[in-house]
Amino acid sequence: MFVEEITLNILQILPQLNFGGVETGTINLAKRLVKMGHKAVMVSGGGKQRDTLAKFGIVHYTLPVHKKSPFSIVYSIKKLKEIIKEERIDIVHARSRVPAIIGGISSYLSEIPFITTCHGYYSKHIFSYAMTWGKFVIVISNSVGRHMLDDFGLPLERMRLIWRGVDLEQFHFREPQIQDKNIYTIGMIGRITPLKGHKFFIKSLLMVSKVMPNIKVLIVGDAPENKVKFKEELKGLVNRLELDKNVEFVGEFGNIHQIMSRLDLLVLATIAPEAFGRVIIEAFASGVPVVATNVGGVLDVIEDGKDGILVPPQEPREMAEAILRVLKNDKLRFSLVKEARKTAQIKFNLDTMVEETLRVYEETVTVKRILVIKISSIGDVILAIPSFRALREKFPNAKIYVLVGLKSRQIVQSCPYIDEVIVFDRNKEGSSFRLFRVAKELSSYKFDIVIDLQNNKISHLLSFLCWAPSRYGFDNGKFSFLLNHRVRFIGLGVINPVEHQSKVLGILGVDIKDYSLKLWPTESDFKYIDEQLSMEWVSREQPLVGINLSSSAKWQTKRWPLENFIHLTDSLAKDNIR
């Protein structure tokens, strides 16, 4: 199935809509969604770009999703649920931690899928784990992906790597030319914070200015409210180094492509791991050579010496040498610029980013993750085979998992209707401890649907602790309030086990048409059977019947009187059945 065949209503939620890499990528995606016939809804705390959305057909709601106050979060969850219902949202897509908490809980309560995009590195705080709540988690670089895997245990099968993309139509490429001029313009673009390395960049300019006294430097971006003092410190450093005639603090600037058109070189001086570095690919697209520090996701973007120059962080001298090398060497500059443009066209273009994001959206809504719980005896699991078959027929593209007891594992191991078997061994450890260990494992799968065919307290509790938005089962009073889709026992009468299961599947729109039971023995099973028959001098053609005496100590209905077994064996013997 292609993404063009599905019309989706997508809600993206992020803290604010000011000028920055996250905001730019989010808005670019929303604009393309609208252009392709989808509905794009955005929720944020407002910002300088908020009022530009309407002209692109993007719906925006302002909520305090940037605030960490518990009262604010609860309020935003309530309001977001209303927005999800009103706009008929198919997917909620969060791009930061507090929005992930709000979006994750709201989508869970609304029974719709939730995904996240990790745009940076997160401290190992409990709230940071909200970024792993998505059915799929998009990471913007290999570096961020490794961080989410190592620090938060995010399973690889739920991770999707999608490079950020630049709009090649917006950033016009300038063919490199031989430069015979005295004034060169160097730019540094980004928020003014200590981690961005402005201090080391400014120190490198002192050395550059001794060789090129007429350089012009544009520091684009502003300091957040809690870093205003740091910005003043940088201005003081510029004055002390007598670079005030060279360096201009431009402030926040919305049209980055206009800034790029003025630059001869872009510098990224980050001292901490950079998640990606959108400004690098914007320079690539514009024909502006780049010198950057070799940290984090920058290594995923720049191939040193081919499409950019990498230098160690916090090393002003090496940075100055790299700046001078690029500006004074036309051959090197030409080569860097041309290769960088190819990199942007092939790897970091907006069209590819949008297409791959839409594929994740499509997979999110079309490939359901379904868990069936049947942790009882072997016979009961065999009787669930018609339910497995019916689910596969109803959801051919779904990933269907089954939770069974240890002894029942082999019964469904080769079942073609099931993608994965998960074992719940109640005897392995203490019951309560084991229960919550299994629950933690199950929650990592991010199931869309849980179907509880076991129908007891443990299975109801496991259903709830999976954190699946939709949970189906019987309303039997045994913790069944933990299920949000229930069938009542009253009025069902005496029915066989398969019909019993069909009542639960029925509220999911699944009809069991084939009640037949089937097993899938392996080659090793047949080999074992042949060996056993040979030892007993029994041919394969000989009809055999196995009888399980006293199959259940718990259920009196499964225990025949002795005379019934005598009658049965006599009848079988008359037909030469052993």
Residue ranges of predicted features:
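Conserved donor-binding/catalytic core segment of Leloir-type glycosyltransferases
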Residues: 11, 179-196, 202-205, 218, ...
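A conserved mid-protein helix/loop that constitutes part of the nucleotide-sugar donor-binding site
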Residues: 23-28, 193-210, 217, 229-232, ...
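Short hydrophobic beta-strand element within catalytic cores of glycosyltransferases
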Residues: 42, 289-292, 302
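A conserved, positively charged/aromatic
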Residues: 108-142, 146, 152-154, 482-489
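Catalytic machinery of carbohydrate-active enzymes
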Residues: 184, 365-578
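Active-site donor-binding acidic/aromatic loop of nucleotide-activated sugar
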Residues: 226-231, 244-253, 259, 309-310
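Conserved acidic donor-binding segment of nucleotide-sugar-dependent glycosyltransferases
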Residues: 304-305, 309-316, 325-331
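A short, well-ordered alpha-helix in the C-terminal region of glycosyltransferases
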Residues: 318, 325, 332-346, 356
